[in-house]
Amino acid sequence: MGKIIGIDLGTTNSCVAILEGNTPKVIENSEGARTTPSIIAYMEDGEILVGAPAKRQAVTNPRNTLYAVKRLIGRKFEEKEVQKDIGLMPYSIVKADNGDAWVSVRDQKLAPPQVSAEVLRKMKKTAEDYLGEPVTEAVITVPAYFNDSQRQATKDAGRIAGLDVKRIINEPTAAALAFGLDKNEKGDRKIAVYDLGGGTFDISIIEIADVDGEKQFEVLSTNGDTFLGGEDFDQRIIDYIIGEFKKDQGVDLSKDVLALQRLKEAAEKAKIELSSSQQTEINLPYITADASGPKHLNLKMTRAKLESLVEELITRTIEPCRTAIKDAGVKVSDIDDVILVGGMTRMPKVQEQVKEFFGKEARKDVNPDEAVAVGAAIQGSVLSGDRKDVLLLDVTPLSLGIETLGGVMTKMITKNTTIPTKHAQVFSTADDNQPAVTIKVYQGEREMATGNKLLGEFNLEGIPPAPRGTPQIEVSFDIDANGILHVGAKDKATGKENRITIKANSGLSEDEIQRMVKDAEANAEEDKKARELADARNQADALIHSTRKAVTEYGDKLEAGEKEKIEAAIKELEDAARGGDKTEIDAKVNALSEASQKLGEKVYADMQAKAGEQGAAGAAGAGAQQQAQPQDDNVVDAEFKEVNDKK
């Protein structure tokens, strides 16, 4: 059985890890980096770039370069968070037929799971290149506060990328696994994982206990905001730069997509620099032009200015921390360790606020970029049976229930319930002789159903006529270890039953997923063909070069007819290499190899002759050298002594 890899599919960056024995290993990608930007670019010729190559060309191709797509995964187009992003993103966010938020690139509509699958495919390939074997299974992380639709969509992305997703695991829980596994403190420890990434924020309170030599990680509570992260911090800086430039130059850059892409890069760079220095300079020559000529942007920014711009965003993370502490039934003083995860936690002001709230310094021995992928890899080794000393008890982040009479949300499973879990409750009809009931499933904390997220609905039909309140309909909720919900309804009188896995009344249908899997496989096939063609062209170029060189040196030893034959074969191979037919190139490579066989024999004979001459000269030289050797030795000795004397 192959390894189960751990993937941190991040909003801004992604990371892949495995366990080698008991040691976690974060794998470098083909560019030599341990994290990969979650950026995907669709080129004019149909090529898809992922990671650093996509990021490098973003400035010149902003409409077809997708980033922060995780913010759209499993979301409806009409959701206010999505509507907010529409005005900020240089690429086009559109409404799919099922009401989901999709993106439009080069005249084709793409579902967010389809786009995220490109990043997952790169992670899969990174692991395969390192392991030297195919990888088919993975544990993928999601923000703890992701709802059912978002988890389902992430699982779909894995399938489209050709991965069997063995488990969806919460990011803070994964970080806790990475942190707690090698710690040998005895007794129970309560830790708070504060995870502020590129697009999402999570806080989890987790208890690590030693139970008969087994490490037990129990999530006591979780909270967060799935639309708050580094991208929002960048946006505050971008808005500030736009405002300053407008005041200074009278030009509004917010409508210029090329300028916006450059501003995004500059904002991210300034934010990172201000974590280690007090001031930075944002310098963007030729940012735009008007009738008076080109305009340059030059702006100094201090750490204090940045902190004032994002203060409200940092403060927004504290309320979920309060709720999580309360839900866990602990006091702030009970927390033994605070772990920071996600790139944004490198910001000194964030660290300061966390210290202020928890009353203690956060641990510095956790890598905020890699801990989540490492934790996912550890969970992978637990699932494959390689590790038997770890038990993970996670929770569902939000309450789940159904709509009952009067539009009330009747909770079936309350938030922070340990998963997997099951719950059943008996309901009845609201009208006399009602032949069917519609079960509407919601997720959220509001008292009225409409204030929560509708995950899906289904009917139970064929209920025998009876006065209202008489039929007994048992509704059962079952959450699996991925946090994905399965719901059933059964008429106790007739035994009639209907079960569904909540796929939301949006999400991707099985047919769509299968089509995307096929597209992805076709893409992989195209990539393979393109690679084979490139290899064939390289081989052709190398052969042409070496043959030409040999003709220049030894051509005078060939008969005129042989030389012409070689020249003709070179010309034919050059023509074939310019085309796109690999079979044709291979055939012409063979033809040139055959045509230049005589030439090869001449080269070989000449090399043999030269080697013979060198051998004779070498033997004579060796004798002379042996005679001179003792003197050489003395010279070297004297040199060493001289150096030692100086010391």
UniProtKB/Swiss-Prot annotation:
Output the SUPFAM superfamilies linked to this UniProt entry: Actin-like ATPase domain, Heat shock protein 70kD (HSP70), C-terminal subdomain, Heat shock protein 70kD (HSP70), peptide-binding domain
Stretches of Basic and acidic residues bias are at: 638-647
- InterPro entries named among the record's database cross-references: ATPase_NBD (IPR043129), Chaperone_DnaK (IPR012725), Heat_shock_70_CS (IPR018181), HSP70_C_sf (IPR029048), HSP70_peptide-bd_sf (IPR029047), Hsp_70_fam (IPR013126)
Q: Does the entry feature the keyword Membrane, yes or no?
A: no
Q: Which Pfam families match?
A: HSP70 (PF00012)
Q: Which UniProt keywords apply?
A: ATP-binding, Chaperone, Nucleotide-binding, Phosphoprotein, Stress response
Induction profile? By stress conditions e.g. heat shock.
Q: Which GO terms describe its molecular function?
A: ATP binding; ATP-dependent protein folding chaperone; unfolded protein binding
* Sections of the chain in a coiled coil: none
Where is there biased composition of kind Low complexity?
611-631
HAMAP family in the record, alphabetically? Answer: DnaK
Q: What role does it play?
A: Acts as a chaperone.
What's the protein called, per UniProt? Chaperone protein DnaK
- Organism per entry: Cupriavidus taiwanensis (strain DSM 17343 / BCRC 17206 / CCUG 44338 / CIP 107171 / LMG 19424 / R1) (Ralstonia taiwanensis (strain LMG 19424))
Q: Which gene encodes it?
A: dnaK
